[in-house]
Amino acid sequence: MGRIAKYYREYGIRIVKGFMQYVWDDKGQRYIDCNTNHGVVFLGHANPKIVEAVKKQVEEIWAVPLNFATPARERFIEEFSKLLPPKFGVVFLQNTGTEAVEVAIKIAKKVTRKPTIVAFTNSFHGRTMGSLSITWNEKYKKAFEPLYPHVRFGKFNVPHEVDKLIGEDTCCVVVEPIQGEGGVNPATPEFLKALREEAQRKGALLIFDEVQTGFGRTGAVWAFQKYGVEPDIFTAGKPVAGGLPIGLAVAREDFGDVFEPGEHGSTFAGNAVVMAAAAAASRLLREEDVPGRAERIGAELAKALGDTGSRLAVRVKGMGLMLGLELRVKADQFIQPLLERGVMALTAGVNTLRFLPPYMISKEDVEVVHAAVTEVLKKAEQQ
């Protein structure tokens, strides 16, 4: 019998069911899901509105190539467009966040005809070869070098160095408004504004990677809206199809015809079932004011995480329901103890516990998370 290759740490838990902000293991233990598959299930496990849309679609048709129109795709773009600022008129459909980053880079290369990509310390953009090339951490890259050579890394959140960083050879600048994997590090408004101005001056495109930050999690539909800085292209993914695989590059209207037939493609992009889920998710986001809910309950969670009373805790970082608790010690030692107390979390960087719960997490859930985090930190202090 074959087996699934192992390249993830295993926690010895078999998850069998999920509903909204909770999951259950095969022993009946319930967990508050603040992991959500790295942010994918922001709209909740088995959300009834998304389940209904998927059930309806699977009885009609599943996979149709992009050469043909489908009602599912048309419904998606109609709903998704309501979430976009006016400048963004073109959506490039993909299957994952890393693919979305790849196509954004391809657009920039085709438009500018320049070689160099600018990225930043502690960045994470994916694990395919292009997005891996602009990811900072060597542990992800070392085994696969040489990667794309024309990458220049600058210091994140250092606006006064931007003019030297972005050159006449720069095709694009790729940045996360809040670094996720790198430590839940929000960009400063001054930094993003400096990138916007210098990219414009040098004829480079500004790309915001919103795969983790986007679709309501930070308290706005798109994190860049909180900064008042618009990119030329932004990527999205994770929660956009309610838990099904999707990636998007969203671009200015004038980039809509940048590729000739054959210059880009994707077998599964625009899958009808995924499109049905994404249309339902987009409608739900708007009708239930998901960003507003994320802002309000996120403030409650941030306050709770900042009130552990532990000397191991440094500060709470992030926005909305994308939060990190920075510690004075390595964070990965707390994942298993939190699981034992019914809380699923994840790490970001070396010393940050990351919390990415669904938007419907309740005040009672926040209290449980607070109690669990407080307990594991206090216990660690005593050892």
From Swiss-Prot:
Reactions the enzyme catalyzes: [amino-group carrier protein]-C-terminal-gamma-(L-lysyl)-L-glutamate + 2-oxoglutarate = [amino-group carrier protein]-C-terminal-N-(1-carboxy-5-oxopentan-1-yl)-L-glutamine + L-glutamate; [amino-group carrier protein]-C-terminal-gamma-(L-ornithyl)-L-glutamate + 2-oxoglutarate = [amino-group carrier protein]-C-terminal-gamma-(L-glutamyl-5-semialdehyde)-L-glutamate + L-glutamate
SUPFAM superfamilies (alphabetical): PLP-dependent transferases
Signal peptide extent: none
Protein name: Putative [LysW]-aminoadipate semialdehyde/glutamate semialdehyde transaminase
The gene coding this protein: lysJ
Any single GO BP term: lysine biosynthetic process via aminoadipic acid
Function: Involved in both the arginine and lysine biosynthetic pathways.
Pathway: Amino-acid biosynthesis; L-lysine biosynthesis via AAA pathway; L-lysine from L-alpha-aminoadipate (Thermus route): step 4/5; Amino-acid biosynthesis; L-arginine biosynthesis
Modified residues (N6-(pyridoxal phosphate)lysine): K238
Matching PROSITE patterns: AA_TRANSFER_CLASS_3 (PS00600)
EC number(s) reported in the record: 2.6.1.118, 2.6.1.124
GO terms under cellular component: cytoplasm
Keyword Transferase recorded: yes
Presence of the UniProt keyword ATP-binding in the record: no
Binding site for substrate: R127, S266
